[in-house]
Design a protein with these regions (language model features):
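Outer-membrane beta-barrel architecture
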Residues: 71, 128, 293-296, 337-339
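Periplasmic alpha-helical coiled-coil/stalk elements that build and connect Gram-negative outer-membrane
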Residues: 5, 40, 68, 160-274, ...
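Sec/SRP-type N-terminal targeting helices
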Residues: 57-61, 74, 133-160, 210, ...
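Acidic, low-complexity, intrinsically disordered peripheral segments
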Residues: 3-10, 28-35, 46, 82, ...
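Bacterial N-terminal signal peptides
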Residues: 14-24
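Bacterial Sec-pathway N-terminal export signals of envelope proteins
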Residues: 27-86, 92-93, 248, 254-291, ...
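Small/polar, glycine/serine/threonine/aspartate-rich low-complexity segments that form flexible
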Residues: 29-38, 84-128, 257-264, 308-340
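Short segments within alpha-helical structural elements
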Residues: 224-246, 399-456
Length: 457
């Protein structure tokens, strides 16, 4: 592929990305048009966020800025052409004293006379040309373009991964709260029915008022818990919309479900390389950028060679008659410039030292990142395994608590069970349900952390 073909391809890609960002921004502009309801899976919510979330959009704009800077650097190696023009009016022309005896033997030495070395009206038009033949700083800047593009692109990838983590966790948080709310409302329906039956039984004198009061207290507690879960669900949904870059007024339905089977679907990673982690990739790219800095300071000892050329026309007179057909005087000049540093007070050496140490510092950061990744993988693997075990246990425990509650309810209706047993069974069921949903959310979050730790998100 030629340079021109690559440039056209890149320009087309930039235009497409700009159009996408512009379209996204327009789509989010405030409008009076009602927003159509949306139904999204967790994956679709992530895709929406990658197109609309402000952090990702800014990262993409930063990438475009870097591409524009790279084109600016490319322009430094191209010919530079500039033009200038001036008009000057001298109502009083500056005079200088000269010895008139230099121009005539008849004039006594030391005879000073004023003499004007200019005219009242002066016009100048000039064009300047320059071309770098060799400049070490320009050479290194051209070589570093690809690395800087890579660095900015990986910044976009890092932003996308962070957004994915936030969206997935927010999505599953809402699902967990809503699932808990659904089961709680089922408990409310059952308890309301039981309270109605108990009141009828109380009217017939078969149970005490204390039994009715206990059920009323339980019902009130459940309704209070329902309000809390409803608020948690609404706030969680608002947080999800924010993490997606979605307007708060947008009606959103979550279509995914939370299940143990889905959480277990996180496939064990058989082979892992640190380059799969975006944080490691960013540090590697940053190291390359610092190495180019080091190279630039080293090359500053080399000379700078460039071509230059100047051409122009001028005219001067004591009368403003530039529209008359009179002679303009042209001039042309060209040459080569060569410059180099002989002694800079050891400044270049100190800059080289600093750049070298910066490279070493990045190498230390890379080694530390490897250790951090190892720790993160160990923790995430252990957390996922333990949370799956806890979820399985809590799921069985909740089912058992439900069976105990159902049996206790039957005994209570048949008059062979007490209200105390009923209250205890209700509390045990609520505790088991809360523990289950906590375990469900923890397992879902640990799955996301596990995938992120292995660069699979």
């Amino acid at each position: 592929m030629t340079f021109m073909q690559a440039n056209k391809k890149r320009t087309g890609w930039i235009g497409t990305l700009l159009l996408l960002i512009f379209h996204t921004g327009m789509a989010q502009s405030p409008t009076n048009t009602p927003l159509a309801p949306m139904s999204l899976t967790a994956k679709e919510a992530v895709d929406y966020a990658l197109a609309n979330q402000a952090t990702v959009r800014n990262a993409k704009l930063d990438e475009l800025i870097q591409l524009a800077k790279n084109k600016e650097v490319s322009g430094m190696a191209l010919p530079q052409l500039s033009g200038a023009g001036s008009f000057q009016h001298n109502p009083i022309v500056q005079k200088q004293l000269i010895d008139a005896s230099n121009f005539s033997d008849t004039v006594p030495k030391g005879t000073l006379v004023p003499f004007a070395f200019g005219l009242k009206f002066n016009v100048l038009g000039e064009v300047k040309f320059s071309q770098v033949l060799f400049d070490p700083s320009v050479l290194v800047a051209l070589q570093a373009r690809k690395t800087l593009e890579e660095l900015s692109h990986r910044g976009v990838q890092k932003a996308e991964i962070d957004v994915k983590v936030n969206v997935y966790k927010s999505y599953y948080n809402v699902l967990s709260a809503r699932k808990a709310l659904t089961i709680l409302r089922g408990n409310l329906t059952t308890l309301e029915k039981l309270l109605g039956e108990t009141r009828e039984t109380y009217k017939n004198g078969l149970v005490e008022k204390l039994d009715v009061d206990r059920l009323v207290v339980q019902l009130t507690n459940l309704r209070t818990e329902e309000i809390k879960l409803q608020n948690l669900s609404e706030v969680g949904l608002a947080a999800l919309k924010y993490s997606m870059g979605m307007p708060m007024k947008q009606e959103l339905t979550l279509t995914d479900t939370l299940s143990l089977a889905e959480i277990k679907s996180a496939v064990a990673v058989e082979k892992f390389d640190y380059s799969q982690r975006i944080e490691y990739q960013l540090l590697e790219s940053q190291k390359k950028a610092y190495e180019y800095d080091l190279k630039r300071y080293k090359y500053n000892a080399l000379p700078i060679l460039s071509l230059f050329g100047t051409g122009g026309v001028s005219r001067a007179s004591d009368v403003f008659n530039y529209f008359d057909n009179q002679t303009w005087y042209g001039y042309v000049g060209y040459g080569v410039n060569l410059s180099f540093n002989i002694f800079t007070g050891f400044q270049r050496k100190r800059k080289v030292d600093q750049a070298f140490l910066q490279v070493k510092k990045t190498e230390v950061s890379i080694e530390d990142a490897k250790l951090g990744i190892d720790l993160e993988q160990t923790q995430s693997t252990s957390n996922l395994r333990n949370n799956i075990v806890a979820l399985e246990a809590q799921e069985s425990n909740m089912q058992l608590a439900q069976e105990v509650y159902n049996t206790t309810q039957i005994k209570y209706k048949e008059g062979v069970g007490s209200s105390v047993e009923m209250s205890n069974a209700e509390n045990d069921l609520l505790t088991a349900q809360n523990n289950y949903f906590t375990a469900l959310y923890n397992a879902s979050v640990s799955r996301i952390d596990y995938l992120k730790a292995y660069g699979k998100l």
